[in-house]
UniProtKB/Swiss-Prot annotation:
Organism classification: Bacteria, Pseudomonadati, Pseudomonadota, Alphaproteobacteria, Rhodospirillales
Biological or metabolic pathway of the protein: Pyrimidine metabolism; CTP biosynthesis via de novo pathway; CTP from UDP: step 2/2
Binding site for ATP: 14-19, 71, 240
Organism listed in the record: Azospirillum brasilense
UniProt superkingdom: Bacteria
Binding site for CTP: 13, 146-148, 186-191, 222
Full protein name: CTP synthase
Catalytic-site annotation from UniProt: 380 (nucleophile), 516, 518
Amino acid sequence: MTRYIFITGGVVSSLGKGLASAALGALLQARGYKVRLAKLDPYLNVDPGTMSPYQHGEVYVTDDGAETDLDLGHYERFTGVAARRGDNITTGRIYSNVIAKERRGDYLGATVQVIPHVTDQIKDFIGAETTDEDFILCEIGGTVGDIESTPFLEAIRQFGNEVGPENALFIHLTLLPYIPTAGELKTKPTQHSVKELLGMGIQANILLCRADRPIPENERKKIALFCNIRPERVIAALDVDSIYQVPVSYHEEGFDTQVLAYFGLPTEGKPDLSRWTSIVERVRKPQGEVTIAVVGKYTSLLDSYKSLAEALTHGGIANNVKVKLDWIDSEIFEDESAVQRLENVHGILVPGGFGSRGTEGKIRAAQFARERKVPYFGICFGMQMAVIESARNMAGIVDAGSTELGKPGNPVVGLLGLMTEWMRGNSLEKRTEGTDVGGTMRLGTYPAKLVPGSKVAEVYGTTDITERHRHRYEVNVYYKDRLEKVGLLFSGLSPTQLPEIVEIPDHPWFIGVQFHPELKSKPFDPHPLFTSFIKAAIEQSRLV
């Protein structure tokens, strides 16, 4: 029998429901249970694919090509369970499905309403595709009291009643602010949040209280009294130095024990947290430090590059070093003298992005790395900019550019040729300039073949790989021979000969990839490209 755990949040947003869900999933796994995590997002977008990174943060892409919330990245990094399209639903998708059913006549002339039609659609999502999981953890986005979240809260209330309290647990994450002038943690915001949730028919069974210090026993009992919860089920979610310390911290607070006790499951014995204690030890006691410059467009909101930052941390864990990230807006390098800021970094990474703003700065960063022999890692747009730089300054194609940015004389990157169609499984995908923007990129996992003896083949330890993609433009294979003659190697190609990886053999470490390797990296299984990149940065640190 599958059991369901619903995680809601109150008081303020950004308390860490996604991390809390991921950490609980990891703890249940460590006790031998099989888990899956899902996210209900209350916005009206069908998916976050067309949302600004400044508003939403990164878009996390799954193997099956879904553009999803960044919390699914936390789920996958903590549990190792590959996320899928069905693990993230939005209000927009729910309403689209309901309206499509109404147009087909599925409701047989009924007046279509939020209750029961929208809530039924949400419940169908929660219960869909369950196989042999012991637990389904379902995070509800937003904060209790938000208008947008109301249908989701009503749906999980109904769902809990339908499966019975023995199979449904409601966890509420709140904030316990410390007021220095009073010298104490204040419980009133938590009390009001629980009351708001109760007004929607949901009694929280466990309270997870975010705090910067331990909760005194008298305060714990006070919360329990006013929130109608047992004192032992008021759990402190303490601030920690590393997010990978959260599972260990939660276990020490008894979180997983109380979850199992609620369901009447055995609580004896300890979970195997050795992988987490080992990771935390490496994070706390690194043997050195390297500085990586991340030259991007959205550096004022670091959530735009959440998986990337974590993957670099994973590379540091694998090499037992601390990775210090220097976030640089690529626009500053459009002033040629500003590139000197890169003089003392040990590696340069140019991540993905869209549009023309800051592109010349990215090209200049790639040029600096190539000419100064600094390790360079270009991801998606960062690979394309590196190829344009090589075309201009190595092959002499001075008007090389991308059709994404205008109409260059030589479209080294563009929506053209092979990039207008490709195979996905047994179906042919086609794109044109007039295709809708949402959900039409090359998305999800695709295979590639690596050149034997190349740097990337050495890094991967194989010549056959699969990686996740999210892009609309591609390096134009027409220029392949011309660029290879001047020292750029196309070391990875798709089965239909789309360029996937480029490298410069005559360079300590210069690799560009069209895909997003950061999406598959985990703290206990770092992606080989990030491990190798940080290793190269360590070597560079000895030269600077």
